[in-house]
A protein has these predicted regions:
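Conserved SAM/AdoMet-binding glycine-rich loop
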Residues: 1-72, 77-79
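Short, solvent-exposed turn/loop segments enriched in Gly/Ser/Thr/Pro and often Arg
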Residues: 13-14, 77-81, 108-119
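Aromatic/hydrophobic pocket-lining residues that form the small-molecule binding cavity
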Residues: 18, 57, 87-90, 153
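Catalytic cores of alpha/beta
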Residues: 20-23, 80-99
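Conserved, mostly hydrophobic/aromatic
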Residues: 25, 35, 94, 106, ...
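A structural motif corresponding to the C-terminal end of an alpha-helix
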Residues: 28, 60-71, 97-101, 156, ...
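Short acidic/polar active-site loop segments enriched in Thr and Asp
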Residues: 31, 103-104
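Radical SAM enzyme core and accessory elements
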Residues: 120, 128-192
Length: 192
């Protein structure tokens, strides 16, 4: 049926599904599964009202990978209250997941407090916003005042990309090719 011709993807919250449900997703031809790794710090996850726990992140991605899905992680750093150690722990967790092979692709971004969100409201109330020029709310620069200098925050996010493009990653991607049509998609994934 159509479930073999239509490839599906979705966003997921770590810690919500068990192995049986990931297996069902794979049987329904889900492929790409995006997990937001907002932080490795439990205190930040609670503060931004994320129902997943840091300890659930690795297990969830391993189950998705075991089911044959292709986990993608969006790693975020740059909260106003985040310490250097907490930001580095989030980056380190992302690298560890990637090195273990439980995620296929990743993205590192600077947290942006979008209007209408509780984070934006808190930033405005506490004077943490650097600008309200909406053209700059594109994840390419820090918009909030943080403990980390802007240059260091930018270096953290850029550093994650240079650390993943290894021979092991390239081999893993080549071995995962299921059809010639995927080769073009793989090229788009690697070019960041």
């Amino acid at each position: 049926g159509y479930h073999r011709r239509v490839v599906l993807g979705c966003n997921m919250i770590p810690g919500v599904l068990d192995q049986e449900h990931y297996d069902l997703m794979a049987a329904a031809n889900f492929r790409f599964v995006l997990f937001g790794l907002e932080s490795a710090a439990e205190s930040t996850l609670r503060r931004i009202n994320k129902c997943g726990k840091a300890r659930d992140i690795e297990a969830s991605m391993a189950m998705a990978k075991k089911a044959g899905l292709e986990p993608h992680v969006t790693c975020m750093v740059g909260y106003p209250w985040e310490t250097r150690a907490e930001a580095q722990a989030t980056i380190d967790l992302t690298r560890r997941l990637f090195d273990r092979g439980v995620i296929d692709t990743l993205q590192a971004t600077i947290v942006i407090p979008y209007p209408g969100t509780p984070l934006f409201k808190e930033c405005r109330e506490k004077g943490w916003l650097k600008t309200e020029d909406w053209d700059r709310y594109d994840m390419r620069e820090p918009i909030m005042k943080t403990e980390l200098p802007d240059a260091e925050l930018m270096a953290l996010t850029r550093g994650i990309y240079t650390s993943f493009l290894t021979p092991r990653f390239i081999l893993r991607k080549l071995l995962a090719i299921r059809s010639w049509a995927e080769v073009g998609g793989m090229e788009r994934e690697i070019v960041v």
